[in-house]
Every structure is written in C-alpha cells, then in structure tokens.
Amino acid sequence: RYNFLGVRDDETARFVQSIGASISSVHTCDPTVFLDVNALPVNSMALEEKLRARGFDFTKPAIGVMSGNQMCRMVRRMYGKRYQIIGLQSPSVYADVNLDDLSPYEWSYVFRYFSLTFTTFFHGTLLSLRNGVPVIAIALESEYSHNHMTKVQDFLLRVGMEDCYFKTDYSRRYDAEIKAKADQLISMNARERILRQMDCEAVNVEKFINCIRRLIVNKEDKENQND
C-alpha cells in the first residue's frame, strides 16, 4: 500500500484512479522544470569551441531539432538555408550540424544557442524552455497520441503554451500552420516570459515537498507513540 502517489500528467492521474487507487494522486512536476541550467558544470567557452569545430556558425541563427530525419527534412523544407539546422538526436542528412558527442550537462546547456527548438520529446521540450528558448512540439505518431493527451501536451497546457503543440504526418499540408507559429515564436523574443512561466510551474514542487514532509512527520509521530 502506498502513502503517496506522484504523477506528472492528468492522463496518468486518471489511470491511477481507474485502477482503484485508495488515495488521490498529487501532480509532481518533472525535476527538469526547476533545473538551474546556468549552474550546470559547463565550461561555456570550451563548449563553444567544440560547436565551432563541428561547424556551428555563431554569426547565423540556428534551429535545434531533437528527433529524426523526417523532422529535419520538414524544417529544411520550411526554412531552406535561412537557419542552421542543428541535429540533437539521430544524425540527419538534412542537418547542417549533428551534435552526437555532447556530455549530458553540455546537452542540457546547448539549447540556449538556438532561436527555436523542434522536438517530439518531453525532456527536450523542458530543457529548451528552461534555457528560455521557445519550442514547437510535434506529437509522436502513435496509437497513444491519437487517443490520449501526451506528457508534452499536458505540460504545455499547464504553462499556457498549448498552441505550440502539433500533430503531423510530415506531409507538406501541415507546413504552413506549423511554420506560422514557429515564425511567431522566433519574432517574439520571449525569453523572459518563458522563464517566468517555467518558474510558475516549478512552484508545484512545493506541493510534493509538503506532502512528503507530512508523511515523514506522521511516520515519526506513530513511531514515537509506539515507543
């Protein structure tokens, strides 16, 4: 029997209740939400030298892509050579630079060099936003994403960015809608607003801490009563 059930999204909360959980679940934000990326042990000068050695041009705007070949091809189709395309996941022939040898800390830090990130992944979404960089989140093509709200979609809804989430089969018919939003995000210079929204979501960690604190206090009280 569990004394605490922490969940990261509403779909999981509904599932937990559907299988007869005897206690209510508590929304527990992913630790990435309150990660201080500026405090990571990253030598920024050394990282920038590494990026230059891979072909990254710091005089040209860049778009990070954390997914496979299809997404890189879509972004290339939208922007041509206007932006550098930086691959962060699987190497792609459509990327100008593929970064597949970064340390976990460097990888968490590198998003700040982009004007925008395209990704299908939850932690890619969070790390980009934690760096103050806007995101276009693309749903993974799966039976789950067709029938349920994904973790990425749930999170973007919580922080008021649900209009940055798209479903696509990567055909050209979706390009105009996605690009219109991407262009808007790039032009907004919304770094400070993004960081404020992330900090607001991070406040939810207090719920988790308070619940755990109460459990510990209750356990200690029971142990003292039994002594």
Whereabouts are the PLM-identified features?
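Active-site anion-handling motifs in enzyme catalytic cores
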Residues: 1-227
